[in-house]
A protein has these predicted regions:
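An alpha-helical, amphipathic repeat domain used for nucleic-acid recognition
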Residues: 1-159
C-alpha cells in the first residue's frame, strides 16, 4: 500500500494554483482538495491566505458566478441554488446576499419549462410527476402550482 506524500507550503500553493487554472473554487473546496492531496492544515491555511491576498479565491464572486450558472444554464430554483452553494461551503449570509441581488422572475423562467414538461397533458399523474420534478429542481410548490394554473388557463382560452 502506497502512502500519500505530504506536501509542503510551496507544493500546496502550486497544486492550488493548478486547480484554479481550470475553474474557480470556493475556499472550502480548495481546502478539501489540498487535504486529500496531503497538505498539512497550517500549510492549507497559509495557502488560502496567500490566494485571498491576491484575490485568486473569493467566495462572494464564486457564489455569484456559480449561482448564475445554476439559474441560467441548469434552470434551478432558489432552493436548489441555496443547497448547491452550501455544498460548496459558501456561508449562508453570502448565499442570501447573492440570491437577493440576482434579478430574476421565477414565473418567467418556470412557466415555459412547466409547459414543455406537461406538453398539454393535464392528467393527475402527469401533473404530479411535473410537480415532483420541479420541486427537485428547487422551485416552491406554490410557484409550480401557479405556473400549472396559468398554463391550464392559457390552454382553455387558447391565449
Amino acid at each position: 500500500m502506497q502512502t500519500k506524500k505530504e506536501l509542503d507550503f510551496n507544493q500546496a500553493k502550486e497544486k492550488a494554483l493548478r486547480y484554479l487554472e481550470f475553474r474557480s473554487h470556493s475556499e472550502k473546496e480548495l481546502s478539501d482538495k489540498l487535504k486529500r492531496a496531503g497538505a498539512k492544515e497550517h500549510d492549507i491555511e497559509s495557502v488560502l491566505e496567500f490566494l485571498k491576498s491576491y484575490n485568486f479565491i473569493n467566495d462572494h464572486s464564486f457564489a455569484e458566478k456559480y449561482a448564475h450558472d445554476l439559474i441560467v444554464l441548469k434552470k434551478f430554483g432558489k432552493n436548489r441554488v441555496k443547497l448547491e452553494l452550501s455544498k460548496k461551503g459558501i456561508a449562508s449570509d453570502i448565499i442570501c446576499e447573492v440570491l437577493e441581488n440576482f434579478d430574476w422572475e421565477t414565473e418567467d423562467i418556470l412557466t415555459p419549462l412547466v409547459s414543455k414538461k406537461l406538453a398539454g397533458d393535464f392528467q393527475k399523474k402527469s401533473i404530479d410527476r411535473c410537480i415532483r420534478y420541479f420541486l427537485y429542481k428547487g422551485y416552491s410548490y406554490d410557484e409550480i402550482k401557479t405556473s400549472i394554473d396559468k398554463i391550464k388557463t392559457e390552454e382553455e382560452y387558447d391565449i
